[in-house]
């Protein structure tokens, strides 16, 4: 392949990963196979290539739709190449085997090749040569249109630059191949006689282009094909070839159905093959082209002789074979060749299925639904049925009966979805007799009897094999069930007295069932009696195919068998197929018979009349069925289906008119010959009247027609009865039927009002009409319509009467008269039992008894169902019924249940492997539904008898009721039917369990919710079983009903939320989906939402804090009236919130970010609980936890939100404070009250391990300390008021001070520690020690809490070492010794109290204490002085000595409230970026000599270091970063060992270029949220100082580049960046020995031309040199990088000065004195650039002042053209050339720099003549630069620190790198200023810019000059706590 498309070119989002991976593998495999096939094809290995292509086409991906968006383009390309090359391979194979093939075979193979090519062209049609090949092949075999289409694709191909049309219009040159294509297109158009196209201008143009061109020659690649041999023979010759052929119809069963099926299969097999004579494909399955088979023979064969229909049968070519040979076409194997017949019971007459046996086709179209819909789809009843015997019969009677009994049974019905044998009895084998069955276990009967026996109710045991002593209907029921067939199922399912669910059906159709009298169910009916023997004898005679069909039709339809005898539905379908293809000939023959003068026999005419009438009736029946189907299912059909229906309806109507005309013609001929055809004429009129009802004609007109027909019937044939047994939609023709139709039409208007869908609007009128019809006592009472309806009802069926009664009772129920409705249903139910127990029933014949029994059971099913539903919804209705009546009804229910136990036993004994009748599944489901309804109604009666509705039921009654429900449910569930009847029994059981609240009913509840809702939940003792029930959706009422049981299971094990099982959590989620949230439209809920919303946005005032801590705060909530109050009272929402919190915590423990969705869900759940139960402090505590976790999550991953005023962090923390305070407030209010839900209180105390007081203390401490600094206590803005003097702004609330917040924390911690309910907690002591430190408590109190924390703390928590309290002890002791609060000896004694103490045993005080720990270890840092943080790095600022004078707090600031007005930074200790400007009039403070360390102090400090190292070793996960940081602090502050301190801090920092973050430390578990970013700030500031001390330019520049974009990883990013820039630039100047103010000394002496020449020379020298970058060049690159990164972010003055200095130093080293050689006219005093004169003295403030330039010197000259000539060099000129130098040397700098600083920079002569390479400055030099520190301020002074420190930032403007010449000239004109004045103005501007920095950075930028002119840097930080 020329190109390869990657498999992952398209991303498939809709496919699963597995499916996508499978496709990719298939594509890869297909490509490999195709390459192998192509290789074999090229080498001529055709067989191997065919095999490979076959394997290729078996891959699924080849056959996918190329338009699928999920399909890779590679598939389309592979598919195109595969089909194209496979077609070419077939063409090559045809060329090699051409001599061995016949003409037909060659044509067939060419067709197959074209099919392959067409499949390829469907994918890609852009290959012109391929289209030309396709066109040539198509034209050869005569497919001219296809050939033309291919050529037109070439002509109009869009892949060409210019189409043929454009080329012709432009008169462009066409090559010979293109001309040949045009010639063929024109030629084909002429051959096809497409004159329309030929007359078009384009064809004229093409014809003119090819007019003089010679015809194209035949392509060489197909020259071996002769097109003349593929010319198709004419139709006439084709017909002749078929004459003399013979068709053998093989029949497996000697019956009419077998004959018709054999004929159909033979012809179907004949036309199934594509390859027939001479390549002609016969598409008409019945050869309607006129070809006749002259001889048709019938042949009886055995089943085994019938060949597989899939065997290939080739037709023989008559050219190669003799014509006299026959053509044998064998049929498919008949599905019904072996007829399985049910045993026909002697009691049931065949007549029962009259008018029903041929309903199969109609049922398939209509699909009528049963009254009781199937509730359990997986109940396993699919193959349940009685045992049957298999016999093969040879008579038509049995064959016909089988079809009547097994209508449309699917062939696979006997093997699909079989149910395993019942657990009660084992399944019986197919050959095992029923007599060998095991006896039925009477346990179920005994259990029920033990409960109902005390009420004198009987439920004796009944056995299927011992029913002789029972009532007659028991024996009848056994006979019906034992010999159950389709006639019984159909009868039972059809007998339903329930009202029609679809009342939109025309009333005439509803009343049709009423016209059928009850005797129709039991009337005898014959089966097909026409014997096929005579026809089979004639099969040996030769006849044509049409004659063969006519003989079948005449034999079957030439009499009245179709209307009076039951036919198999398959036979009727076959006859209709034959008639569909014979009706043109029949109609033509009848018409010819009428018009020609030939004399036909009377028998032939009468026979034709019978056939025509039968066909007319078949079409009429189909039209009626179609009318009803369209009426019922219109809403369920698509527009396309409706159009098809309309077309079908139109076709049927045309066919009906044709046959009606035929029947009328034949009737007239018969009357002319005086033939007796009265019956046929009456049949025709009756069917026509039935059709008129479907046309919705006027009722009066229809009634008149029926009355006229009644007169005609009385006159001509009063005793005539035509059953129409095979026409389910045509009523029986008899005088009674006519009378019934007339009565129906008389009362149609009356019943239309009853059955109308609008009848419910006037329920009173409907009741009155039904009462008049049903309850009329005399014939004269009522109006005329009522009398007519009453008369009609006397002859109507019992089912119809019951239907009217149901309508009346339902109307009572809907109108509120439920009591009357119940009485009516009870009377109906009582009458049903009397009907079975009377002597009249026993005296009936078996057929009548069975019919009445099934009808009674069907009616009882509807009656009991309605009673159970009404009484369950309204239990009080049974109270008005007498106890005796209830007892009678209960016994009646038990009697019917005993009867249904006969069915159960038979059902349990079935063999699932045996076939079952078609409708057995639906019938068995109806029996089981009946049983469910009976048990439901019986329980309601039994409960009424036991007074089960009383409020205070004894335990024995509750136990009895619960046990009955449990036993019955187990029995019903065993048969997978407990959820039948819309789950009425399961719903009743659930209601009773919830109502009675029995302690031992939990198992029953679990089983019921499993069956009803599909909820799979188990307890410790019971696991519900699968009853095969189909669950329904859980509703709100259901969830509220049994949520108490679920909550009890939750409260059972309250040790942890994680102990709640996963299935229980899933159930709670389902319950929440059903219950939902409180309704916001309810007044109480809406009010509480408003109160809660206002409360959570209120500020946290000191007044509210005090009231809450005293329990005196109240919120105006209302008592909820929401229906979900019961769930909330049970703790449902509260527990859900706890689960959501636990889920979030679990995600955090997995070292992954928690899902905020869980926290939001927790807030929602707790809010719902507060809306319903606002006084539950557990929910307030939970929602406070959720808000605090949201705050922590926002501060976990980014510091961005710390600098945003009124951010979501502050909002969530404020809500957490408010809710936490209210939780404590409610707890204090309820401390003496008994909890409303003790289980929830116990669960809450067990789950929420943390005390509320401890949580509140942590919440206040986190909100008060850094980095938040009390932002959540501040308001977003101030209030604006209008007073007497105008508008003014102030805060009207008293906000808490920092000291007050710390006092709240101390009080909460003290309560938590002293609480007896909570065990001692190490964190409480730990946090209180920190608060004591903030509140300036005594050292003994602080140490006491730390030591208690160590004593209580465990060694490990969750597998990790606990180091916090131990580190706290070391850090505080170090701080106390440094501040002089403890002596070294005292601190050393206290240090021994930590178990991690390691004693230092060295004797030398000067011993090095460097640590050789692994540099790759991950460690952290600590700085715990939040309260003293005043400057930008105040948390890292501590006094340098204990003797520092204290600062007296100002009275004005002490105790001042936190206010936005106090946002101005308060003067604090000197920091690293603080500008130290010493007043010129005040002398500098003399340096204090540091006191040497004593041996005890050295031992103490060294022991601290060893102890901290011990902690580092114990920290296996390297998460704790504060011990290494404290070690580094001790090295720096005590021993002044900067390199050891640096080695301790190096593992924290990423000094490699691969990492983007400058520092990397982990957050320990007990570290406050957001504190992590403060530590990053402290460590960076500290490490920058260490790098400056050790002259590490490489590390400081690397960190500087990473620091610029690290603004979201720390606090005060701008200050760290400014400090880093300042320190790095000072360091670069120092290591290169650049004197101060070098530019001021050099730039005035530079001449521009000379400077420009030297700068260019320096650049050329460096760029041309092959040596690596020099040290100065590398530093210049780093300085320029700092300048670039700082551009637009901060002030660039210092960085610009460094770049200028470094570049000037490079020029000096390069040019020496020549740099100033041409500047003699500008200065009277020469400037010396070498030796010691170039260096400045250490003590000097500035370099020696240069002589003033000569007054006569000019700054600029003029060129010849008059323009000014630039002579002066500015800083911008130097910056521009330095930038150009860096760009020119880009290959040597950047990533290519190899900067080595271990040996330091090159030695530079100092002022005293010595040189130094040391990387670390001396201690004495550092002491001169260290400022004195201020002591720690008190908490009162720091109250103002809670003012907002995060305000807007004002960015400084940035100077451009270069300006235009005009700006430079204007700058040069300022010659009156000296260089010193310019420098002073520049620094003044920078100071102004620094003062404009935002207050959010806490201090202005730290740039000033000291007394000695050097920028000082403070390295001191506060000691960690």
UniProtKB/Swiss-Prot annotation:
Keywords: Chromosome partition, Nucleus, Transcription, Transcription regulation
Subcellular locations according to the entry: Nucleus
Record's GO cellular component terms: HIR complex; nucleus
Keyword Transcription regulation listed: yes
Comp. bias regions, Low complexity: 1806-1818
Acidic residues: compositionally biased ranges: 1402-1425
Biased composition (Polar residues): 413-422, 1899-1910
Main location: nucleus
Any GO BP annotation: chromatin organization
Ranges for region Disordered: 350-439, 1402-1466, 1738-1769, 1799-1921
Biased composition (Basic and acidic residues): 353-376, 391-400, 428-439, 1757-1769, 1819-1836, 1861-1890
Function statement: Has a role in a nucleosome assembly pathway that is required for the integrity of heterochromatin and proper chromosome segregation.
Stated family: Belongs to the HIR3 family.
Protein name from the UniProt record: Histone transcription regulator 3 homolog
Organism: Yarrowia lipolytica (strain CLIB 122 / E 150)
């Amino acid at each position: 392949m020329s190109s390869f498309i990657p498999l992952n070119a398209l991303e498939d989002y809709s496919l699963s990963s597995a499916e996508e991976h499978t496709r990719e593998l298939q594509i890869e495999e297909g490509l490999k196979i195709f390459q192998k096939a192509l290789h074999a094809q090229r080498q001529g290995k055709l067989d191997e290539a065919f095999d490979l292509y076959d394997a290729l086409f078996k891959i699924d991906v080849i056959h996918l739709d190329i338009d699928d968006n999920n399909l890779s383009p590679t598939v389309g390309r592979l598919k195109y190449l595969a089909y194209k090359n496979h077609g070419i391979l077939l063409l090559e194979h045809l060329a090699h085997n051409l001599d061995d093939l016949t003409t037909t075979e060659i044509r067939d193979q060419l067709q197959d090749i074209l099919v392959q090519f067409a499949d390829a062209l469907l994918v890609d049609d852009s290959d012109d040569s391929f289209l030309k090949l396709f066109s040539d092949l198509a034209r050869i075999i005569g497919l001219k249109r296809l050939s033309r289409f291919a050529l037109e694709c070439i002509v109009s191909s869009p892949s060409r630059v210019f189409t043929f049309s454009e080329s012709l219009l432009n008169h462009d040159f066409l090559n010979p191949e293109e001309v040949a294509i045009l010639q063929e297109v024109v030629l084909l158009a002429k051959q096809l006689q497409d004159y329309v196209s030929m007359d078009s201008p384009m064809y004229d143009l093409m014809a003119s282009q090819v007019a003089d061109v010679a015809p194209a020659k035949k392509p060489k690649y197909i020259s071996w094909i002769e097109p003349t041999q593929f010319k198709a023979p004419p139709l006439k010759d084709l017909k002749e070839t078929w004459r003399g052929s013979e068709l053998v119809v093989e029949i497996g069963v000697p019956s009419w159905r077998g004959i018709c099926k054999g004929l159909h299969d033979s012809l179907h097999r004949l036309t199934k093959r594509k390859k027939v004579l001479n390549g002609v494909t016969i598409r008409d399955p019945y050869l309607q082209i006129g070809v006749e088979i002259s001889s048709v023979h019938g042949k009886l064969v055995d089943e085994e002789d019938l060949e597989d229909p899939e065997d290939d049968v080739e037709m023989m070519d008559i050219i190669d074979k003799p014509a006299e040979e026959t053509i044998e076409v064998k049929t498919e194997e008949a599905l019904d060749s072996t007829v399985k017949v049910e045993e026909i019971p002697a009691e049931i007459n065949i007549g029962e299925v009259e008018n029903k046996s041929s309903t199969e086709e109609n049922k398939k179209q209509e699909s009528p639904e049963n009254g009781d819909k199937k509730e359990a789809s997986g109940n396993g009843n699919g193959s349940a049925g009685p045992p049957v015997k298999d016999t093969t019969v040879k008579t038509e009677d049995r064959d016909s009966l089988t079809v009547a009994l097994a209508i449309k049974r699917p062939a696979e019905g006997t093997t699909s979805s079989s149910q395993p044998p019942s657990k009660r009895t084992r399944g019986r084998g197919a050959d095992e007799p029923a007599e060998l069955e095991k006896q039925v276990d009477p346990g179920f009967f005994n259990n029920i009897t033990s409960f109902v026996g005390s009420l004198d109710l009987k439920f004796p045991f009944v056995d299927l094999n011992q029913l002789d002593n029972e009532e007659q209907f028991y024996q009848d029921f056994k006979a019906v069930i034992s010999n159950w067939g389709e006639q019984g199922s159909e009868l039972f399912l059809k007998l339903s007295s329930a009202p029609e669910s679809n009342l939109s059906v025309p009333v005439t159709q509803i009343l049709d069932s009423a016209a059928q009298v009850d005797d129709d169910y039991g009337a005898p009916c014959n089966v097909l009696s026409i014997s096929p023997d005579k026809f089979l004898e004639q099969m040996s005679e030769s006849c044509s195919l049409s004659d063969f069909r006519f003989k079948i039709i005449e034999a079957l339809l030439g009499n009245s068998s179709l209307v009076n005898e039951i036919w198999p539905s398959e036979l009727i379908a076959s006859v209709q197929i034959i008639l569909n293809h014979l009706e043109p000939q029949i109609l033509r023959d009848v018409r010819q018979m009428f018009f020609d003068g030939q004399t036909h026999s009377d028998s032939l005419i009468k026979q034709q009349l019978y056939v025509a009438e039968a066909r007319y009736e078949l079409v009429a029946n189909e039209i009626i069925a179609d009318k009803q189907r369209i009426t019922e299912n219109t809403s369920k059909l698509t527009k396309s289906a409706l159009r098809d229906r309309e077309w079908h309806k139109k076709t049927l109507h045309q066919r009906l008119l044709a046959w009606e005309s035929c029947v009328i013609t034949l009737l007239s001929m018969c009357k002319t010959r005086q033939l007796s055809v009265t019956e046929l004429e009456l049949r025709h009129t009756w069917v026509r009247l039935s059709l008129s009802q479907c046309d919705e004609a006027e009722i009066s007109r229809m009634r008149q027609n029926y009355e006229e027909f009644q007169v005609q019937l009385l006159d001509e044939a009063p005793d005539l009865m035509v059953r129409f047994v095979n026409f389910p939609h045509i009523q029986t023709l008899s005088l009674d039927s006519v009378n019934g139709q007339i009565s129906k039409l008389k009362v149609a208007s009356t019943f239309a009002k009853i059955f109308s869908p609008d009848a419910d609007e006037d329920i009173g009128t409907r009741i009155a009409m039904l009462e008049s019809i049903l309850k009329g006592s005399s014939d004269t009472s009522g109006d005329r319509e009522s009398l007519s309806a009453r008369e009609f009802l006397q002859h109507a069926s019992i089912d119809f009467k019951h239907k009217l009664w149901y309508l009346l009772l339902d109307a009572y129920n809907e109108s509120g008269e439920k009591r009357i409705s119940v009485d009516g249903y009870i009377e109906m139910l009582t009458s049903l039992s009397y009907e079975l127990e009377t002597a009249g029933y026993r005296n009936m014949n078996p057929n009548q008894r069975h019919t009445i029994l099934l009808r009674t059971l069907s009616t009882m099913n509807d009656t009991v169902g309605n009673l159970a539903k009404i009484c369950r919804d309204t239990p009080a209705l049974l109270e008005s019924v007498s106890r005796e009546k209830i007892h009678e009804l209960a016994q009646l229910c038990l009697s019917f249940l005993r009867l249904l136990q006969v069915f159960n036993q038979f059902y349990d004994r079935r063999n699932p492997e045996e076939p079952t009748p078609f409708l057995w599944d639906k019938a068995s489901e109806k029996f089981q539904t009946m049983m469910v309804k009976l048990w439901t109604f019986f329980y309601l009666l039994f409960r009424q008898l036991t007074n089960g509705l009383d409020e205070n039921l004894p335990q024995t009654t509750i136990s009895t009721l619960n046990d009955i429900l449990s036993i019955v449910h187990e029995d019903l569930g065993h048969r997978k039917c407990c959820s039948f009847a819309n789950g009425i029994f399961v719903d009743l059981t659930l209601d009773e369990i919830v109502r009675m609240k029995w302690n031992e009913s939990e198992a029953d509840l679990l089983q019921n919710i499993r069956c009803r809702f599909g909820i799979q939940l188990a307890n410790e003792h019971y696991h519900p079983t699968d009853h095969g029930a189909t669950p329904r959706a859980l509703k709100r009422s259901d969830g509220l009903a049994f949520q108490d049981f679920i909550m009890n299971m939750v409260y059972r094990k309250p040790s942890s939320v994680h102990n709640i099982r996963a299935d229980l959590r899933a159930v709670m989620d389902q319950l929440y989906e059903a219950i939902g949230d409180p309704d916001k439209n309810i007044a109480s809920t809406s009010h509480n939402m408003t109160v809660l919303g206002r409360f959570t946005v209120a500020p946290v005032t000191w007044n509210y804090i005090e009231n809450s801590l005293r329990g005196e705060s109240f919120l105006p909530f209302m008592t909820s009236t929401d229906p979900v109050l019961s769930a909330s009272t049970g703790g449902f929402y509260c527990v859900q919130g706890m689960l959501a919190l636990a889920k979030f915590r679990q995600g955090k423990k997995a070292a992954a970010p928690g899902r905020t969705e869980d926290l939001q869900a927790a807030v929602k759940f707790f809010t719902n609980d507060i809306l319903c139960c606002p006084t539950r402090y557990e929910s307030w505590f939970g929602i406070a936890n959720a808000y605090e976790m949201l705050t922590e999550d926002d501060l976990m991953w980014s510091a961005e939100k710390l600098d945003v005023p009124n951010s979501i962090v502050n909002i969530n923390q404020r809500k957490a404070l408010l809710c936490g305070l209210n939780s404590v407030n409610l707890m204090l209010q309820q401390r003496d009250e008994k909890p409303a839900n003790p289980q929830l209180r116990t669960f809450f105390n067990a789950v929420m391990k943390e005390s509320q007081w401890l949580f509140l203390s942590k919440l206040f401490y986190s909100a008060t300390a850094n980095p938040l600094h009390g932002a959540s206590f501040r308001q977003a803005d101030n209030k604006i008021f209008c007073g007497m003097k105008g508008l003014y702004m102030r805060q009207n609330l008293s906000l808490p001070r920092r000291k007050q917040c710390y006092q709240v924390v101390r009080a909460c911690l003290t309560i938590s520690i002293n609480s007896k309910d909570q065990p001692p907690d190490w964190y409480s002591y730990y946090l209180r020690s920190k608060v004591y430190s903030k509140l300036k408590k005594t050292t003994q109190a602080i140490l006491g809490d730390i030591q208690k924390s160590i004593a209580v703390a465990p060694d490990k928590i969750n597998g990790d070492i606990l180091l916090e309290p131990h580190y706290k002890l070391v850090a505080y002791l170090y701080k106390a010794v440094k501040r002089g609060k403890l002596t070294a000896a005292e601190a050393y004694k206290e240090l021994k109290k930590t178990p991690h103490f390691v004693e230092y045993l060295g004797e030398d005080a000067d011993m090095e204490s460097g640590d050789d720990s692994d540099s790759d270890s991950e460690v952290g840092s600590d700085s715990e002085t939040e309260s003293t943080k005043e400057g930008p790095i105040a948390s890292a600022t501590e006094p340098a000595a204990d003797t520092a004078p204290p600062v007296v707090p100002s009275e004005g600031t002490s105790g001042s409230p936190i206010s936005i007005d106090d946002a101005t930074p308060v003067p604090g200790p000197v920091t690293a970026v603080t500008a130290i400007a010493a007043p010129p009039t005040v002398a500098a403070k003399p340096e204090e000599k540091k006191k040497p360390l004593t041996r005890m102090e050295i031992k103490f400090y060294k022991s601290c270091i060893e102890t901290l190292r011990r902690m580092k070793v114990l920290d296996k996960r390297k998460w704790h970063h504060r011990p290494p940081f404290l070690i580094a602090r001790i090295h720096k502050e005590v021993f002044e060992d900067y390199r050891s301190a640096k080695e301790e801090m190096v593992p924290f920092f990423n000094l490699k270029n691969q990492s983007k973050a400058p520092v990397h430390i982990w957050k320990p578990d007990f570290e406050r949220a957001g504190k992590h970013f403060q530590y990053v700030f402290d460590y960076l500031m500290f490490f920058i100082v260490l790098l400056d001390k050790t002259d590490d330019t490489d590390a400081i520049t690397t960190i500087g580049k990473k620091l610029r974009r690290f603004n979201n990883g720390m606090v005060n990013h701008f200050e760290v960046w400014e400090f880093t820039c300042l320190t790095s630039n000072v360091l670069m100047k120092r290591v290169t020995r650049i004197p101060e103010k070098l530019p001021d000394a050099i730039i005035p002496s530079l001449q521009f031309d000379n400077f420009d020449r030297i700068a260019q020379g320096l650049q050329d020298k460096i760029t041309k040199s092959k040596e690596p970058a020099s040290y100065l060049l590398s530093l210049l690159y780093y300085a320029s990088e700092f300048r670039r990164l700082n551009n637009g972010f901060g002030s660039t003055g210092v960085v610009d000065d460094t770049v200028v200095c470094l570049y000037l130093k490079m020029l000096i080293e390069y040019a020496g004195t020549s740099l100033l050689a041409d500047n003699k006219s500008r200065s009277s005093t020469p400037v010396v650039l070498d030796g010691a004169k170039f260096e400045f003295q250490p003590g000097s403030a500035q370099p020696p002042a240069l002589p003033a330039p000569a007054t006569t010197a000019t700054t600029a000259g003029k060129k010849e053209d008059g323009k000014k000539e630039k002579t002066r060099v500015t800083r911008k000129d130097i910056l521009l050339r330095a930038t150009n130098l860096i760009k020119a040397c880009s290959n040597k700098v950047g990533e290519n720099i190899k900067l080595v600083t271990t040996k330091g920079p090159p030695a530079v002569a100092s002022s005293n003549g010595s040189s130094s390479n040391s990387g670390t400055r001396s201690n004495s030099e550092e002491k001169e630069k260290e400022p004195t520190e201020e002591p720690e301020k008190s908490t009162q002074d720091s109250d103002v620190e809670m003012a907002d420190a995060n305000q807007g930032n004002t960015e400084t403007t940035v100077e451009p790198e270069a300006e235009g010449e005009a700006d430079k000239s204007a700058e040069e004109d300022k010659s009156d200023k000296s260089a010193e004045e310019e420098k002073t103005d520049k620094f003044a501007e920078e100071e102004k810019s620094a003062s404009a920095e935002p207050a959010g950075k806490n201090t202005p930028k730290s740039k000033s000059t000291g007394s000695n002119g050097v920028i000082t840097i403070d390295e001191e930080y506060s000691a960690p706590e």
